[in-house]
Amino acid sequence: MIKFSVQKNDILDALTTTAKAASTKSVISALEGIHLSLTGNQLTVTGYDLELGIKSTIDVEGESDGVLVLNSRLICDIVRKMPSGVIRFDEYEPLKLNLMCEDITYSIMGINSEEYPVLPELSRGESFEISEPLLKSVIGQTLYAVATIDTKPVLMGSKFEIKNNELNVISVDGIRIAIRKESLLHEDFDFVVPAKTLSELLRLLSDDESKIATVSVDRNQGIFSIDKYTVFSRLLEGDFFDYTKIIGMPSNIEAVVNVRELMECVDRTLLLLNDKIKSPVDFTFSDNTLRVFCETAIGKLDQKIKCDYSGEEFRISFNSRYIL
């Protein structure tokens, strides 16, 4: 039976992170739990809902090896409310656990670990390494354009496409297309990662340039190894939108605008808009100038920004929220 002692901050970090992958409501009670497995002084903490899994291994002071599943919400709340210091986990009878810290003792019931699903393993597939900050950046700059309505489920994720030694990360929601390109030496292949997985990766990835993430995928599973966490994800299947038909279209209209100035200008238009009052924002390009104009029942905004543009006057309208 499992017995160990651990610093509150260490176990709380592992529990709250892996709990994000635990099911919030399932007919299988084990899926609502966090799986604890102790071997020596290494405690492996896992949350898994059959779609997303997060695993972490931390150092503890082990007394007796064992395995136990605990309700994720309950164990996180208990540990969070414990005072700082060492917490002792003591399974004194099968599926009966004491948690002790200073003069506080909680006694809770565990869940049969035999009901807990096994994390997927990749028999074969593709893998590549990428710095954690770079992976964080490409996800962060494309995730906003992932579809949120499941009319075509494969679009509810971002496509990672390696082609001609270049990594393209693409998100499409039917209105916007976001693409980020980076050099990556690898054979051609592609896969689609669900938005939920990408959101969790954003929280876990570091800004430390020295840290490297390993991405491994097969036909329908992906594994992301990042520092002290391993993220498991079912991949999305289906025909992704062929963005090359739009992005590859020739155009003789091109303008270069200062990003900060443009964002500040478009942000000002939001003062004239609300849930009931909606209006497009007009962009007019002419002679190295971009005119941004928006008029509603509340008022109007008219501003000019310097830009690099030459050619005939060109006007186009956008939803301001999609520009931001």
Please name every model-derived segment.
Residues M1-L324:
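Structural preference for solvent-exposed beta-strand-turn elements
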